Every structure is written in structure tokens, then in C-alpha cells.
């Protein structure tokens, strides 16, 4: 039996994780980054950009459900949704399950990610690219929100880590543009790394977002693929009541949506905003 090739993630300098490669499906440099999609016996198909794992078939549902359904069900009546990034299609799939949403705009800087994820990760998008409500824009997210005259009810930043093409999606310019692009009562959420190992991301996002939103916080989910396990998501709005919604109302919104999830529940939603003391202390000390 031949030894399998090993792929090593390069996100952290002093520790990390590896994946055995059963078959490489695609590996090329796009116009913006190095893209590889390969098969792994335990996790299914894996996609990485510039040496950092972005998604796996095995547990992508956790990430996409939590970054979609928490803001949309908190809002309760979102008609227009903007996705920044999201080229693998998973976020689009989950947003499109909300039948009350009338327009979905996705802004992805790298057309290659969209093209090859549609080909090699079809279960992520699950046909949602053909949804008539969907509009794809190939552009830099900062540039889009800076120039956009449209308004949205929910903005989801499905960004990579703050290196390479994703770095601009952690800047004050981007957050200011998102705040300006939200309707009254709108909600902004964003991927914010594994806080235990990438605490500076949360601290930086909190400081910057607080300049443009009245209510800024974080929520979390356990996602095995991301080294360190507990992924943190930024939350920003101008109405604290949206974040503090009671369980009865959330259950009503969830039941009315008709959506069935594998990870998200209204109870998980409520619990996800209970943050560990080390994060609360770090945010307080940084003020």
C-alpha cells in the first residue's frame, strides 16, 4: 500500500494541522491566490486558499448555517441580502433557503474560486447559483460597498483570514461601507477566526466596528476543520434587541421559515452569544 501524500496547512508558524490527500481534484494559481481542492477520506472534499483550509464537505454546514441563520432569523424579515466572499457557494445555498428573501447579491473578488468550486464542490452550492434571486458580482468587497447605492437588510462577510485578498475585509473602510449599505434595522456579520489563537482579529474588529455600529458583539460555533475548534463571528447592528431576541420569538421565526438544519437551532442561537471570559476580558482591556 503506497503512502498517501500529506498536505500541511500554513496558517500558524509554530503549530498546525495536516490532511492526507487521497486525490487532488484541482490545484492552480488563480488571478489572486493559490487554490487547491482535494479529497480526504475523513472530511470529503477540502478546499484551501494560499495554504489555509477554507472549507470541507464534512463540517461546512456548521459554518454556513451559523453565519446565515443567526442574522436572518434575528432580523425576521430580510428581503435583500449581501454576501461578501462566499465563492464556494455554501453561504448562498443557506441564504437561498429563506423564501422571504427577494434578492441575493454575492460579491467575490476571485472568479476562479466560483468557477472551480461549482465544478468540484457542487454540494456546497447545491444548485443555488441558478436561483433567479441571485446576482453575482466579481469585484473587491471594499470597492463594492464604497460605491454601492443599494441598501441591504443583512450583510454577511464570508471572508478569508486577514492576509492576501481577505485583508481588506477587516479594515475600517470596509466596515464603514457596510454600515452605510445597511437598511435601518440591518445586521452585519463576519467570520472572525478562532479567537483563542487569533484574538487580535476579534479585538481589531470590535474596535473598528464600534465606530460605525451601536451594538457590536460576537457569537461562536464549534467547527472541527478550523484549527483550535471554536470559530468566532462578529455581529454588528444599531439595535441591541436584535441580538437579545427571546427564545420564543426565535422559535417562531425558525418554524415559519420551514428550514431544517443539521447544527443550528434557536437554542444554539441563544447560547452562541455566551462568550468565554478570556474573550470578554480581552475586549474590555482593549478599550
From Swiss-Prot:
Any Pfam family hit: Spermine_synt_N
Annotated positions binding spermidine: 64, 88, 158-161
Keyword terms, alphabetized: Cytoplasm, Polyamine biosynthesis, Spermidine biosynthesis, Transferase
Residues annotated as binding S-methyl-5'-thioadenosine: 33, 108, 140-141, 165
Gene Ontology biological process terms, A to Z: spermidine biosynthetic process
Annotated metabolic or biological route of this protein: Amine and polyamine biosynthesis; spermidine biosynthesis; spermidine from putrescine: step 1/1
Protein name: Polyamine aminopropyltransferase
Keyword Cytoplasm: yes
UniProt xrefs under InterPro entries: PABS, PABS_CS, SAM-dependent_MTases_sf, Spermi_synthase, Spermidine_synt_N, Spermidine_synt_N_sf
Residues of the active site: 158 (proton acceptor)
The protein's role, per its UniProt record: Catalyzes the irreversible transfer of a propylamine group from the amino donor S-adenosylmethioninamine (decarboxy-AdoMet) to putrescine (1,4-diaminobutane) to yield spermidine.
PANTHER family, sorted: SPERMIDINE SYNTHASE, SPERMIDINE/SPERMINE SYNTHASE
Naturally occurring in which organism (per UniProt): Pectobacterium atrosepticum (strain SCRI 1043 / ATCC BAA-672)
A molecular function GO annotation: spermidine synthase activity
UniProt similarity note: Belongs to the spermidine/spermine synthase family.
Taxonomic lineage from the root: Bacteria, Pseudomonadati, Pseudomonadota, Gammaproteobacteria, Enterobacterales
Keyword 4Fe-4S included in the entry's annotation: no
EC number(s) on file: 2.5.1.16
GO cellular component term of the entry, any: cytosol
Amino acid at each position: 500500500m503506497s503512502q498517501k501524500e500529506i498536505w500541511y496547512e500554513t496558517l500558524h508558524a509554530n503549530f498546525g494541522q495536516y490532511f492526507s490527500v487521497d486525490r487532488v481534484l484541482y490545484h492552480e494559481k488563480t488571478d489572486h491566490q493559490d487554490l487547491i481542492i482535494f479529497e480526504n477520506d475523513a472530511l470529503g472534499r477540502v478546499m484551501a486558499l494560499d495554504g489555509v483550509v477554507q472549507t470541507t464537505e464534512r463540517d461546512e454546514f456548521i459554518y454556513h448555517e451559523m453565519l446565515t441563520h443567526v442574522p436572518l432569523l434575528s432580523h425576521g424579515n430580510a428581503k435583500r441580502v449581501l454576501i461578501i466572499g462566499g465563492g464556494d457557494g455554501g453561504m448562498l445555498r443557506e441564504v437561498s433557503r429563506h423564501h422571504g428573501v427577494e434578492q441575493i447579491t454575492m460579491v467575490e473578488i476571485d472568479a476562479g474560486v466560483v468557477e472551480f468550486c461549482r465544478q468540484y464542490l457542487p454540494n456546497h452550492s447545491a444548485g443555488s447559483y441558478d436561483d433567479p434571486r441571485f446576482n453575482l458580482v466579481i469585484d473587491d468587497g471594499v470597492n463594492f460597498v464604497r460605491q454601492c447605492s443599494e441598501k441591504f437588510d443583512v450583510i454577511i462577510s464570508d471572508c478569508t483570514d486577514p492576509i492576501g485578498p481577505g485583508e481588506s475585509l477587516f479594515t475600517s473602510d470596509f466596515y464603514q461601507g457596510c454600515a452605510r449599505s445597511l437598511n435601518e434595522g440591518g445586521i452585519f456579520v463576519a467570520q472572525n477566526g478562532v479567537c483563542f489563537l487569533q484574538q487580535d482579529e476579534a479585538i481589531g474588529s470590535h474596535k473598528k466596528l464600534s465606530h460605525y455600529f451601536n451594538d457590536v458583539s460576537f457569537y461562536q460555533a464549534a467547527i472541527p476543520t478550523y484549527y483550535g475548534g471554536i470559530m468566532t463571528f462578529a455581529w454588528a447592528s444599531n439595535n441591541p434587541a436584535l441580538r437579545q431576541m427571546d427564545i420564543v420569538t426565535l422559535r417562531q421565526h425558525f418554524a415559519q421559515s420551514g428550514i431544517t438544519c443539521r447544527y443550528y437551532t434557536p437554542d444554539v442561537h441563544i447560547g452562541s452569544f455566551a462568550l468565554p471570559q478570556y474573550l470578554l476580558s480581552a475586549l474590555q482591556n482593549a478599550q
